Each structure stands twice: as C-alpha cells, then as structure tokens.
Amino acid sequence: MAQQYQPGQRWISDSEAELGLGTVLAQDGRLLTVLYPATGETRQYALRNAPLTRVRFSPGDVITHFENWKMTVREVDDVDGLLVYHGLNAQNEVVTLPETQLSNFIQFRLATDRLFAGQIDQLSWFSLRYNTLEHTSRQLQSSLWGLGGVRAQPIAHQLHIAREVADRIAPRVLLADEVGLGKTIEAGLVIHRQLLSGRANRVLILVPENLQHQWLVEMRRRFNLQVALFDAERFMESDAGNPFEDTQLALVALEWLVEDEKAQDALFAAGWDLMVVDEAHHLVWHEEKASREYSLVEQLAEVIAGVLLLTATPEQLGQDSHFARLRLLDPNRFHDLKAFRAESENYRPVAQAVQELLDKGKLSAAAQKTIHGFLGAEGDTLLAAVNAGDDEAKARLIRELLDRHGTGRVLFRNTRAAVQGFPERKLHQYPLPCPVEYLELPVGEHADLYPEVSFQSQSDASEEERWWRFDPRVEWLIDTLKMLKRVKVLVICAHAETAMDLEDALRVRSGIPATVFHEGMNILERDRAAAYFADEEFGAQVLICSEIGSEGRNFQFSHHLVLFDLPSHPDLLEQRIGRLDRIGQKHVIELHVPFLETSPQARLFQWYHEALNAFLNTCPTGNALQHQFGPRLLPLLESGDDDEWQSLIDEARSERERLESELHTGRDRLLELNSGGAGEGEALVEDILEQDDQFSLPIYMETLFDAFGIDSEDHSENALILKPSEKMLDASFPLGDDEGVTITYDRNQALSREDMQFITWEHPMVQGGMDLVLSGSMGNTAVALIKNKALKPGTVLLELIYVSEVVAPRSLQLGRYLPPAALRCLLDANGNDLSSRVSFNTLNDQLESVPRASANKFIQAQRDQLTPRINAGEEKITPKHAERVAEAQRRLAADTEEELARLTALQAVNPTVRDSELVALRTQREQGLAMLEKAALRLEAIRVLVAG
C-alpha cells in the first residue's frame, strides 16, 4: 500500500540521515517536498519510491520539544494523519506534544533497533563503517580540504590565492596573474573549495564563447565538477520553468547572454552565490558610457554576493581599465576615477621602498621617510628594528604595508619574474621554398597564411594531388620526426582540416604513429587521442592539434612544439606555446617553426620574432602592439615595399621595448608579495606532497571496493581497472561508468594520462562511496568471538561507537571545529571502559566471525542484560562529547575574534574591507556557537564480543 503523506508529518531520510528530522511541506502530483529545518535543506522525492522512514515514537521513548524540554511518551494519537504524543515532562506534569513541534535535532538509535531485530552484519562492514567515520573526520579538519584533490601539480602561489580567497565569506576579488600562471586553476580551486565547504552552493561562470569548451574540460578533468554548458539551443530546449535553476554550476557564453533578454531574466531569477567572469578585461567601460556586456556583469555583481574576475594584468590594461574592473567588485570604494589615480600614485613610493628593502636588505633615508608617512609613529619602532638588522621586524614591516595596500585584498597579480620556475625557450626556424601551386591562389583573408586550406577548397584534386604531396613543410615535418625518433612532439596548426590532412600524410608517407585532436571530436575521443599520445611505450610519437582543439589541455610531458603555421594574433601564439611552457616543465621548450619564403608566413614570423619577441619570451605587450600596428600590419603581410615593412618592424620593436621598460619600472613588489603568499603557499605544497605519499587512501578504497563488490585488477604501474562484479551490492555506487573505469592514485600519472580517474579523498567516487557507507545501516551491528587467554570464556564485552556531531548548514563551516567524530567505548561486564587500553585495530586482530543465526540467538537471549549496558555507554561517552563541544566553541570564538580584530583594524587603514564582511562574520560566529550548543551524540554502531 502506498504511503499517505500529510503536511506537517515528520520523516527521516534513509540516505541522508545527517539532514535531521524532516517535515512534509507538500505533495504535488508525483512529487513530495520535504524540508529539513536543522540544515535549511529542501528535498524533492518521487512519490512512489521516496527513501523516507516515518518517525513514530512508542510509549517509553523520551522525545524533545523544539524549545528543548523533554517528555516521556505514554500514549500516541493519530489525528487526521498527524501524530500527537501524550506523556510526562521532567517535572512529572502531563503534557502534549504534536509531532509538528518535535525538535529538529532528535537522533535515532537505529543500531539498537537492528541489533535486537536480528540484522547483524559482517565484521568487515563494521570495520569499514568505523574507518569511514575516522577518515571523514580527519578530512573535514584538514587545511588541504578542497586544495589537494585537483589534477594539477601543487603550485605555491595558486594554493595561497585559492585558500586566501575561498576562505572568505562571499569573496570579491580580481585575479590578474600574467599568462601561464594558472588563473583558471586558481578560480577552479576557489570554486571547488567553496562548494566543498558550503560557502557557495550555486556558481555562475561567464566566459567568451570561444573559451566555453576550455572551461568545461578544465572543470571536469581537473576538479571533477559537472558544469552545465548553456547556449541558446539548450536554453530553448529545456522543459524547466527556469533552466538555470536545474543546475548547480552554469557555464554561460557572454555573447549569447547579452543578446537574449529572456535568458537574462531567468539568470537573475535563479539566484547565485558566486559569479566567475573570465577575460573580464574585454568588458568595455568609460566614464561616459559602458558597453552592454559591462553593464550586464555590473547588474549581476550587484545581486550576487561573491564575484571573481579573471583578467589581464593591471599594467596591460592601463589604469582606467583596471579601475573599471575594481568598481565591479566594490562600487562604493571605487567610485571616482580621479581619486583612484591619485591614490595609486601615493602607493607607488611605498612599493619602491619595499623593492629597496628586498633588493638591498636595508632602507635609504628617503625610503624610511616614505614608510613613516604611510605608517605614522607606530611604524617607527619597526623601522628602528629593521635598521638594526632584525629579519623578523623586516617581515612584519612588509606585512603591515601589505595590509594597508590600496587594492591588496581585492587584487591578486603574480608575475613570471616573481614566481620563477619557467623553462627556457629555444627557437628553430626553417625557411622553405614556396611551391608554385600556392603562388597561383587568389588573395583572400589570411589565404596566404594558410594556403593549404585555400588550395584544398579551390581544388577537386584527386588523392594524388592533395596539398600535402607538394607542400615542403610536410616533407620537413617527416624528416624532423624521424630525426627526433621516439621523442614526443606536439604539432599545432590553425585549422581542423589541416590537422586531419597531416595525420593522413604521416600515415601514407611515413608510417610514423600519429594521432589528431580537433574541435570536431567529442571529449571522449579527445581523451583517447591524448592518452595514445601520452603512452610512453606504445603511444603516438606526434599529436596534431587544431587551434581550438588544444584549448584547456596540458601536454607538458612533451617539450618539442612544431608550429606548422602561425596564428593571426599574438595571444593565440602565446596560447599555443603555453600548452608546453608551464610551471613544472622540466625541459627547455624547443620551438620548431617552418614557413614558406617570400610569403605572408615569412613576414608574420618576422613580426612575431623581431618586433614582438614572442617566441623566446612571453609577450605581455602583444595585445597593445597588435591593436596599435594591426591596421598597417595586415596589408603589408600580403604585399608591400621591403623598406616600409622594415620600418614597421623597427617602430614596433622600439615601442615594445618602451612598454616593457614601463612595465618593469611599474612592478609592484608589494602586490607580488601579497599575491605570492610569502612562504604560505610553499607550506601547502609540502603538505599536499606528503599527503600524496601516504597509503591510507588506497588501503581504505580496497576495503570499500571489496564491500560493494567492485572488482579491481592491475592496468599498469600505478593504475587499476575497476569493474562492477556480478555480486555488486549497490548499483548506485559512483563508479562513473557501468562498463568500468581506470584509476590511479599517482598525481604524475594522472597528469600525463587524462583518460584515468585521479583518485583523492575529494574525488566523487571516494566521497560518494563514503556517503553510501554512512547513509546506510550496513555495518552498524556485529557479533564476534574474541580469542584472548586473559578473558574468561563466556565473558561479554560491548563495543559502542558513537558519533559526536553538529547538524547545521554547511555554510557555517562547523565541520572545521566539530567534524563528525567516532567516539569509542569498550565496556566490560563491570561497566568499565577499556577503549583507552585496547585500540580498535588491536581488538580487531583478536576477533572471529560468528554465524548470523547463532549470533541472533545469543543476542535475543542476552537482550535484557545488553539493554541497560547500552544505555550506560552514553553516560561514559557524554563527558568526551561535552569536551569536544567546549573545545569547538572555544576555537570558533577565538578564530572569529582574531579575524574580526584583524579586519576591524585593517578597515581603519584600508577601505577595501567591506562592512558587510564584518557583519557576516559576526553573524556566522553567533549562529555557529548557537548550533554547537545543540551538538548531539548518536549511537552509530554496536559490536557484541563473546570470549571463547
């Protein structure tokens, strides 16, 4: 018979017991809506198979009113589908308690119910449950939570920024690192950590259309975040009232959004906690007028609490454009462009003084005067100590200046010069004769930059007359690959057609193992191609990528890059080289550039090399120079006087050198120090590498796979293949693929093999598997024989596992202070707790299984003796629980007081500290302390041990 649901009834979730007591809100057609007031969560279930259990107390049970008074139940009435409890309160007065007024924090002793009902589990499941609780508690307390699980090398400045930003309430910051320093990874880390911690639940990512796929790949591959990509087609096809409400992470192209008012309305109505905007420097703003894109982002920033803007460096932007980004973050603070310019000028001497201190280790009289003017009398003591050679005082002085830096809290900008660790680049140029077939082609937009595409589109050529049979770059490529033998080589060209033709050419003309990578392939096909290229033993020597196809991929295990043609913009050139030129690259980048002589290709090569110096170094001025000289450049590529061409090269080179000199002079070392973390990031890197070396995760996962019937077999070194077995316990186990999946626990292996799942404590498979253990009841009862000569045969020991926890909204971050913890109690026949003398693992080694029928028979015979002993266990464990709660309250109060004091002092000297931050922190403290008061003990598991 189907369940009858009534608004106001109390139910508990079978799969999410941690949500607390639920209240039925509504039954609408086939859907049931349940509110969980303790956590503020709402769930909708299909009516026919809702995973819910009706909460119905019996006479003798002690229940709690939401105002915290208790009553012992004597009678239960059913009034129109709602239960009404009658009984006595602590003063022995007759009271009535409708189920609608039950406390939301009531805990259920399901382990006791199962034990006495004969539902006794295997010893291995009991151990798995205990170990899962232990690991969960440890991870929630870890400072690495949300930082260590990304598929990337841990890099100090990225980790520092991620922790600093993600740990703020509703962060509003500008990420403006130089190219190649990983702004996307920084943003992904912030999103990931905010989602895991509960500080954010819904995230909107706005990007240029051409970067949508790159973001999709990065979020999925690196962070295991399932992002929904929205465009006009998906939006129109959705059956939902508001398509954006159905997703936690939305990836939206700004070009489409700005043209679709209906989509804008839906986006605003959906509600978001965090907005990330990539390429924010393309949002055009002037004091007189802003672009439609800028205005739309501005309106969103007014209603979304957290905002991350990813942008070019301030020096590249220019001061006015930089101000335009800052006013999106805090329009009250950054409201006047003239005032901002004046303020920026005031900070420049301070940054120069810090530069002097860092470079020379001491301060000139002029620098000391500057710092005195900035810090006032309170800085004089520090200055005196610095002059006396006190290194600690020097570090503190820099910290004080950092805190007062005008945009230090909202702007993070790392430079290659400050970060270091980048490889050298070496250029190999190969001028080749231009074939006659190309000389006869009609002139068109970029036709002579990519003559093979133009030739093939004009020709009905047979297989024998394909462009790759006469183009000298193909012959050169084959010779180069043969010379490099088995060295991995990445080839990038502008068009997918060229990439596919080159693969054909290599197969037909040389037999060199190659694979291709272009935008026409789906993600699975790209993964297979990337894996084939990465395989050292049997893989392809060469991977041929189109321009768009390679976005978001990291091939830094290779260090030879062939630029088969050149892109029309320096940013695209930098993007190509950036596939290999990244932090962590251990080899010199060998750049191979073939080009056709006396063609536009030759001139474009000369432009990039001689004018922009874009091959041997990153080119932060490239965009500005292209904008300035582009109108003259394009006509001269096709044709033009040699003297006029050389004049353009010389002029652009001089302008580049001038701009680079300005950039170097304007370097803000104070900001670089703040962005780099001054050593904090390095400590995080060490901790992550240390965690990577531990074996606790593989050992735990092997027991988890065994318990759920997942077969694992060796794939290769450091890799396993997982497949569901015929005895798979739960089809909802998050394996990721019904057919099977290849995993690795090794970070380096995962970086080179993107077709493998990188398993960490944060991975959805691990988290999902642990949730299945703890949300189910398997393993919360066990009976065993204990073989110990010190125990008299027939002696009964009782092992009780309690969970000390607080049920609260995740956004309060109480897991950092009072994570769910297993509190263990081992009672002998006299009621003594032996747990401090006998560890869980020591005890486990002495146990043998008991057949379920025999175990059940024993439990029923001992029920009257076991019940009071189980009740006595809570008295033993309550002091430990109370101690944990008191310590959690102390730490929460101390941490928030310290942060409030720091921010309050900082606000007096740095206006970028918002009042809303302080208010939110105080509110969070009060709510957190109140929730900790309601922390409860829950009997999680019982094991009965009989000496034999």
From Swiss-Prot:
Q: InterPro entries, per this entry?
A: Helicase_ATP-bd, Helicase_C-like, Helicase_RapA, P-loop_NTPase, RapA_C, SNF2-like_sf, SNF2/RAD54-like_C, SNF2_N
Tell me the domain of life: Bacteria
Cite the Helicase ATP-binding domain residue spans from the record: 164-332
Molecular function via GO: ATP binding; DNA binding; helicase activity; hydrolase activity, acting on acid anhydrides
Sorted alphabetically, the keyword list is: Activator, ATP-binding, DNA-binding, Helicase, Hydrolase, Nucleotide-binding, Transcription, Transcription regulation
The record's SMART domains line, in alphabetical order, gives: DEXDc, HELICc
Motif stretch (DEAH box) = 278-281
- GO term, biological process aspect, one: regulation of DNA-templated transcription
- Domain Helicase C-terminal stretches: 473-627
Q: What is its EC number?
A: 3.6.4.-
| Residues annotated to bind ATP | 177-184
Q: What does this protein do?
A: Transcription regulator that activates transcription by stimulating RNA polymerase (RNAP) recycling in case of stress conditions such as supercoiled DNA or high salt concentrations. Probably acts by releasing the RNAP, when it is trapped or immobilized on tightly supercoiled DNA. Does not activate transcription on linear DNA. Probably not involved in DNA repair.
Q: Which family does it belong to?
A: Belongs to the SNF2/RAD54 helicase family. RapA subfamily.
Assembly, per entry: Interacts with the RNAP. Has a higher affinity for the core RNAP than for the holoenzyme. Its ATPase activity is stimulated by binding to RNAP.
The identity of this protein, by name, is RNA polymerase-associated protein RapA
Q: Which organism is it from?
A: Pseudomonas syringae pv. tomato (strain ATCC BAA-871 / DC3000)
* Gene that encodes it: rapA
